[in-house]
Amino acid sequence: MRLDERHYDELRKIEIEAGYITHPEGSVLISAGNTKVICNASIEDRVPPFLRGEGKGWITAEYSMLPRATAQRTIRESSKGKVTGRTMEIQRLIGRALRAVVDLEKLGERTIWIDCDVIQADGGTRTASITGAFVAMTLAIQKLRAEGAIKQNPITDYLAAISVGIDSQQGLLLDLNYEEDSSAEVDMNVIMTGAGRFVELQGTGEEATFSREQLNGLLDLAEKGIKELIEKQKAVTGEVIE
């Protein structure tokens, strides 16, 4: 049994609250245990210069963390005047993952900006951001369709992400909190579609190597968690695949 009394294959308590912020076209607060992220989706009727005249849209993301989202205060990146490599990596990951499940031509020449702001961090902030961002994006696209701005549904599948890892004492674990992530011998972030296809895997043997058998176990565990997350998403968005 883990410190928070979860079983090895059990998600933290997942809550997705829609309409958390008034102004964005899509907005949610996603909570994964003590990790909480506000995910907003904003629509602009223009695309980056490299896509002008191409007849397709774009999806991009920004990610940030409040100074006291963590146990010790961190300096705002805006105060430093530059974005850290970690932040840049996560931003690109979120945008890349969302684009994998959207037909950009059906979106038309518009951009969906995803803003993920971590207000409390206890591990899994990037995976929670992706899971919440998909819901925020879907709500924004549903609004576009309701207004008649687009006729066809550009979303091709659901999308969610989760962390898995290997602990020297407890073995395989699903949905690591900060303490578990810090002590894990192996940790991995897995992004998958509703059809069970992989979008991205980020895995590292921090303190130990791992076998093919263990890798398969991690992926099976991640797939189980992602199926559960997608059911949570559907409770907010309804069925979005036509």
Curated annotation (Swiss-Prot):
Q: Look up the record and give one Gene Ontology term from the biological process aspect.
A: rRNA processing
Reading the lineage from the top rank, the first entry is Bacteria
EC number annotated for this UniProt entry: 2.7.7.56
Record flagged with keyword Heme:
no
Coiled-coil blocks: none
Which EC class is this protein assigned?
Answer: transferase
What's the stated role of this polypeptide? Phosphorolytic 3'-5' exoribonuclease that plays an important role in tRNA 3'-end maturation. Removes nucleotide residues following the 3'-CCA terminus of tRNAs; can also add nucleotides to the ends of RNA molecules by using nucleoside diphosphates as substrates, but this may not be physiologically important. Probably plays a role in initiation of 16S rRNA degradation (leading to ribosome degradation) during starvation.
Annotated protein name in UniProt:
Ribonuclease PH
Q: Keyword rRNA processing on this protein?
A: yes
A Pfam family this chain is assigned to? RNase_PH
**PROSITE patterns under this entry?**
RIBONUCLEASE_PH (PS01277)
Name the reaction it catalyses: tRNA(n+1) + phosphate = tRNA(n) + a ribonucleoside 5'-diphosphate
Assembly and partners?
Answer: Homohexameric ring arranged as a trimer of dimers.
Q: According to its UniProt record, which protein family does this protein belong to?
A: Belongs to the RNase PH family.
| Residues that hold phosphate according to the record | R86, G124, T125, R126
Q: Name one GO molecular function term.
A: tRNA nucleotidyltransferase activity
Report keywords, A-Z: Nucleotidyltransferase, RNA-binding, rRNA processing, Transferase, tRNA processing, tRNA-binding
Biological source species: Bacillus pumilus (strain SAFR-032)
